[in-house]
Amino acid sequence: MFSWLGNDDRRKKDPEVFQTVSEGLKKLYKTKLLPLEEYYRFHEFHSPALEDADFDNKPMVLLVGQYSTGKTTFIRYLLEQDFPGMRIGPEPTTDSFIAVMQGDVEGIIPGNALVVDPKKPFRKLNAFGNAFLNRFVCAQLPNAVLESISVIDTPGILSGEKQRISRGYDFAAVLEWFAERVDRIILLFDAHKLDISDEFSEVIKALKNHEDKMRVVLNKADQIETQQLMRVYGALMWSLGKIVNTPEVIRVYIGSFWSHPLLIPDNRKLFEAEEQDLFKDIQSLPRNAALRKLNDLIKRARLAKVHAYIISSLKKEMPSVFGKDTKKKELVNNLAEIYGRIEREHQISPGDFPNLKRMQDQLQAQDFSKFQPLKSKLLEVVDDMLAHDIAQLMVLVRQEETQRPVQMVKGGAFEGTLQGPFGHGYGEGAGEGIDDAEWVVARDKPMYDEIFYTLSPVDGKITGANAKKEMVRSKLPNSVLGKIWKLADIDKDGMLDDEEFALANHLIKVKLEGHELPSELPAHLLPPSKRKVAE
């Protein structure tokens, strides 16, 4: 008797088993989170319902910046080819949102056709109306970079009233819609004319719930000298500190992302290193895409729960017959108190609550009599999903990550930075002398030999203790010197001959110049007398 109670309880505790992360996210959303969203009209307040394409699409990169900061040129630099609809110039050229995506043939799909395509993740943009859809296109082209990621180019942010009035649609709301769905948001600034307008500040604030996705690029940095660049960088960090309210510092990449010669080449090495870091960040997106989607679903579930508590609290406070309008105004004005009460009753973090002013504005237009009371079962299902099913999916996420290559984005600008003499760091540090016929250490060997013969060699070798006395003079930590010893002691006899000692000193010099040590000794650094032994 009542055995079905036990079965239901057991079913609730056992998390579902999924084949892929994408399939699991889709099923969890449709069966567990969507019913809660629909019951409390979540989509009217926050974000449209998710579709299959939102879970299946490639990682997307959103570029945001004021006009003429180099957004379109940046995409052209990554792809190493023009894309349909591309316009570049010092004036505000890009007047549309352009989704640059992989396609078999070059072409443009207009916005109205794009939002009815179930395979594209843009169907819910339909809500922004014709004024926006006439300014939204998809540029398709065959390109190796676009096989792994898609890029969203945005119109330059204007100053003054034009930004809000002449566009005909809510620009900040559209950006927020994209920000929820993309994997990386890149804010571009022009180092030559650094200016953060009030409109740009508002846009950055609209993206404030997505700081984890944000990266900053200080572009066109080759147009100013080192001293000016330091001042511009400091000014940018100060300005961002006032707009982005996070204790962590947003990562800023400095460079010149176009294929023209550097105007002031003083900081070439810095630009190359920064470009490599940015490319590595973009290349990691396909590998981390499943984790990002899982993270976004958890974020959405937490907001949906808070929204349910807010709506049900408002419903509970409303009178059944008289004085509804007066009570509605009173509740909207006292929303901060309702937030505080929900926070205390349900132990919810203040960061999970929606923006107070925005919520008040939205509630003004709502009919409170249509709100639903608290339905515990819907919330329990979401709690169960967060506690059990998400943990199961995390295991699957890790499995999928290990099966994927570390750097999945290939082609375009990503290809030229990997190999050959123009690869990053080629011929520098431990790579110095890689193409030379002569052993690179031989240049300084006479100087190292003088030191070697003062360390009392026996049968042409010095002991580890004597070598240590000399090596610690470099003031490098023991962990680094230990690694250098392992690399230099090629025959592993615990002693160093003159060539091995010279090699150890060469590696110390490499480290002192700020380069990383190799994990294994490169072939060109092997002393000539040891090359046959190593083979």
Swiss-Prot record:
Ca(2+) binds at residues 489, 491, 493, 495, 500. Pfam families: DUF5600, Dynamin_N, EH, EHD_N. Residues 55-286 form the Dynamin-type G domain. One of its GO terms (biological process) is regulation of cardiac muscle contraction. Residues 65-72 are annotated as: G1 motif. Residues 243 are annotated as: G5 motif. The modification Phosphoserine is found at residues 349, 456. PROSITE patterns: EF_HAND_1, EF_HAND_2, EH, G_DYNAMIN_2. GO terms for molecular function: ATP binding; calcium ion binding; GTP binding. Residues 198-227 form a coiled coil. Residues 476-511 form the EF-hand domain. It is found in: Recycling endosome membrane; Cell membrane; Cell projection, Cilium membrane. It is a peripheral membrane protein. The keyword Phosphoprotein applies. Residues 444-532 form the EH domain. ATP binds at residues 65-72, 220, 258. Keywords: Acetylation, ATP-binding, Calcium, Cell membrane, Cell projection, Cilium, Cilium biogenesis/degradation, Coiled coil, Endosome, Isopeptide bond, Membrane, Metal-binding, Nucleotide-binding, Phosphoprotein, Protein transport, Transport, Ubl conjugation. SUPFAM superfamilies: EF-hand (SSF47473), P-loop containing nucleoside triphosphate hydrolases (SSF52540). Residues 91-92 are annotated as: G2 motif. Residues 219-222 are annotated as: G4 motif. The modification N-acetylmethionine is found at residue 1. Residues 153-156 are annotated as: G3 motif. The EH domain interacts with Asn-Pro-Phe (NPF) motifs of target proteins. Belongs to the TRAFAC class dynamin-like GTPase superfamily. Dynamin/Fzo/YdjA family. EHD subfamily. Homooligomer, and heterooligomer with EHD1, EHD2 and EHD4, ATP-binding is required for heterooligomerization. Interacts with PACSIN1. Interacts with PACSIN2. Interacts (via EH domain) with MICALL1. Interacts (via EH domain) with RAB11FIP2. Interacts with ANK2. Interacts with CACNA1GG and CACNA1H. This is EH domain-containing protein 3. It comes from Rattus norvegicus. The gene is Ehd3.
